[in-house]
Amino acid sequence: MTEIQKLTNNKEIIAYLAEKFPLCFSLEGEAKPLKIGLFQDLAEALANDEKVSKTQLRQALRQYTSNWRYLHGCRAGAVRVDLNGEPAGILEQEHVEHAAAKLAEAKAKVAERRAVEKANNPKANKKRSVYHSGNKSENKKSAGKKFSKPRQVEQIFVNVDLANLQKGDVVRVKAGDKTTKAEILEVVKEGARVELENGLILTVSADRLFA
């Protein structure tokens, strides 16, 4: 008899729910607002499923509905869906405002974290610039030129461990020969959904994510 492999974390459970109920849950793009009382429907639908427990389902749902993708989708006029993707009522204004407040709060925390990081980085950046410069006169001559040498600093970055990534973590994303800072919005299968400093949101593979 094959031993049933139990799911152990929210990421796995959400992926499992998206597989079982693809018209209700999603791993990419904007998430749909869920029907009020969906947990009870979910618990009944998976009552005989040994992979997940009610406690795990509740925790996974809490994480799913606090995700930025979900909060973005909770706007005026949005329609809630049930497990089969069927309409289950229009999102109430009270819940629209609550989602907007939660999203603003989450973004404020990210902005605060970035500010702290920027405050800590200048010293390191100054040290690097000293290593790559000869003297002041040379620096003035090279001020208007493009150098590829400083880009070599990227070589010190190491690939991140997806298992340790969390929403809100700041990483570097490699695009060609360049890297740019990005904020983790969600860890997905074999990669992560990130927001770049310019506001662009995209999904990148693990081999392009660096610490």
Curated annotation (Swiss-Prot):
Name a biological process GO annotation.
post-transcriptional regulation of gene expression
Subcellular location per UniProt equals: Cytoplasm
Give the residue ranges for region: Disordered.
Answer: 113-147
InterPro entries recorded? ProQ (IPR023529), ProQ/FinO (IPR016103), ProQ/FinO_sf (IPR036442), ProQ_C (IPR035236)
The organism that produces this protein has a lineage beginning with: Bacteria, Pseudomonadati, Pseudomonadota, Gammaproteobacteria, Pasteurellales
Q: What keywords would UniProt list here? A: Chaperone, Cytoplasm, RNA-binding
Q: What name has this protein been given in UniProt?
A: RNA chaperone ProQ
Coiled coil stretches, renumbered: none
Question: Superkingdom of this entry's organism?
Answer: Bacteria
A Pfam family that the UniProt record links to this protein: ProQ_C
Q: Which gene encodes it?
A: proQ
